Amino acid sequence: TASATIAREIHGAAEDKGVGFLDAPVSGGQAGAENGQLTVMVGGDAGNFERAERVIDSYAKAITHVGPVGSGQLAKMVNQICIAGIVQGLSEGLHFAKCAGLDPALVIESISKGAAQSWQMDNRWRTMVDGEIDFGFAVDWMRKDLGIALEEARRNGARLELTELVDRFYAEVQAMGGR
């Protein structure tokens, strides 16, 4: 993830040279990249998007042209804000279950069939419960992405109080050696 401002600056430099440019961040992590299952959020001119779509399709399961240059990065910021909040909520929910004397596996079996279901729940709950920190996305990278999103929020006036709090929690994980 990069800032929308950087994407716009690169676009300007590319345009000066007569080169088309798209900002097209991805979601899906290493496993998604290895399996051609990435989700791509594309910002840029519609004509450039149409010319590049077949190439992007070779490594993506989903491609969405979300708007002009910079929009791809902004959509990725939304993705990261959501993931950070979901992971925090899942972690706290599982902690609550353990403290309440519930079997986390049974709780997950139940709630994963309802409105709380998410990719993070399906793929991360076991490592959280077992204390096996298997970061598919490093803490440092999440902090970078949240920092970019929070900076953009300061520019556009969005209030992201929960994201600020979750970012502080990630900072605590970093302070304990999480990378």
Indicate where each model-derived feature is located.
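A broad, low-specificity signal for short, low-complexity segments enriched in glycine/proline
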Residues: T1-S3, I111-S112
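Helical "substrate-binding/catalytic lid" subdomain
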Residues: R51, G70-R179
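Rossmann-fold dinucleotide-binding core
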Residues: A2-I81
